[in-house]
């Protein structure tokens, strides 16, 4: 694993519709520099392949908790890793900020005093339009 940096930060990142070519340049840069990645179960394996082998990668569904406690555990892992000085990515399917503000992650991180940044993902409709070709 990478040596922790002086100040940890959490990046709430959208994986878009699953095509790595549709990630922003910033998203790819941050993903490759991450020390800890917590990802949704449905994030494309092609996107997960961009993560360096030295990075601690965890599928949030494998944290071993029931659905009711899962979000609290995710919050706990994000906060702990950032407080330890790590660069942390919370990688979500599509866009990280649906109607509930990343499942309350922005609010929880702010209340905990953890530095965070949102890196949007391409919406599925935009990805479909970008992939449209003529024959």
Residue ranges: model-predicted function:
Residues 1-20, 25-122, 126-127:
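Class I S-adenosyl-L-methionine
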């Amino acid at each position: 694993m990478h040596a922790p940096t002086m100040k940890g930060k959490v990046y709430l990142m959208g994986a878009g519709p699953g095509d790595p070519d549709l990630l922003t340049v910033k998203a790819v840069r941050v993903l490759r520099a991450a020390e800890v990645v917590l990802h949704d179960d449905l994030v494309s394996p092609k996107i997960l392949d961009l993560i360096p082998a030295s990075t601690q990668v965890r599928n949030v569904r494998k944290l071993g908790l029931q659905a009711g406690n899962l979000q609290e555990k995710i919050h706990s892992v994000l906060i702990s890793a950032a407080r330890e000085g790590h660069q942390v990515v919370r990688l979500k399917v599509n866009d990280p900020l649906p109607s509930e503000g990343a499942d309350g992650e922005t609010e929880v991180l702010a209340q905990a005093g953890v530095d965070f940044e949102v890196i949007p993902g391409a919406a599925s409709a935009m990805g479909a339009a970008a992939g449209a070709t003529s024959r």
